[in-house]
From Swiss-Prot:
Known cofactor(s): pyridoxal 5'-phosphate
Protein's name according to its UniProt entry: D-cysteine desulfhydrase
GO molecular function terms listed in the Swiss-Prot or TrEMBL record: D-cysteine desulfhydrase activity
Pfam families: PALP
Organism: Yersinia enterocolitica serotype O:8 / biotype 1B (strain NCTC 13174 / 8081)
GO BP: D-amino acid metabolic process
Protein family according to the UniProt entry: Belongs to the ACC deaminase/D-cysteine desulfhydrase family.
Uppermost EC category: lyase
InterPro entries found in the cross-reference section: ACCD_DCysDesulf, D-Cys_desShydrase, D_Cys_desulphydr_bac, TrpB-like_PALP, TrpB-like_PALP_sf
Catalyzed chemical reaction(s): D-cysteine + H2O = hydrogen sulfide + pyruvate + NH4(+) + H(+)
Amino acid sequence: MTLQHKLAQFPRLDLVGNATPLEKLSRLSDYLGREIYIKRDDVTPLALGGNKLRKLEFLAADALRQGADTLVTAGAIQSNHVRQTAAVAAKLGLHCVALLENPIGTSQENYLTNGNRLLLDLFNVEVVMCDGLHDPNQQLAELATRIEAQGFRPYVVPVGGSNAFGALGYVQCALEIAAQSAGNVTFSSVVVASGSAGTHAGLAVGLQQLLPQTELIGVTVSRKAEEQRPKVIHIQQELATSLGVTSGPADITLWDDYFAPQYGMPNEEGLAAIGLLARLEGILLDPVYTGKAMAGLLDGLEQKKFRDDGPILFIHTGGAPALFAYHPQV
């Protein structure tokens, strides 16, 4: 049975539609002297786009299968995941409750009210603030219990949509990459932001089956490699088991030099990467995920960290709405 047939066994809503574009960044390639391509998951159809919609195709299908009427999730005030979950809930006629934290402890009005947070109000989300997501799985379980006691039927969507079920969305993305690149380009490396780990794990499983000679590099956005690796491997192994395939921890490569000072705080290298791609390609990155991941790609070229000189694919996971929340830093 092919990977595509195995994936088709899982309930899935069609939220993404057609494959997202895979394009060569010609001006950036000329500037860097290296072939750079981009997978445009920032232009998925709903709520200004982003990678979480792929995960929500499977998670929301499971919620409907279970008869849920409420999606419950958590994240930072400027969470792209919460924004996309809220939009899916609105599209499906479901209630959405979001447990939010302020991970950078800022009182800047733009961060607290603009960007993704503004969109949550438009999507009519019930927002519950907390001091911090120290144990998000437990905190979400407790919140779901309270919501259930009010007569609702909650479905918990994990932080980032990152569990083995949500990560199926990035096996689908790997299928798209393989189909779009076939006969056109052979990627030496793929670079992606690695945060809640589901996107990274899904790509790890999918690419190992479809493009086993391609190196996958996760640029961490919130923690050091020794903390991130177990998170990626845990989802990778659960996902591989559910699909009946083999995917080994040896395929998990992490670069952790680019997320300082902490998750959610922009840094100089990330902001420079945002500016570079905007000026050369008219494409918007974000200061939390893709800006830092692109900074890793650029520095990786400078430091000759890639294993060879072949073409590189950058996975654009979205996040541009957060730009407005980080003004005037951006």
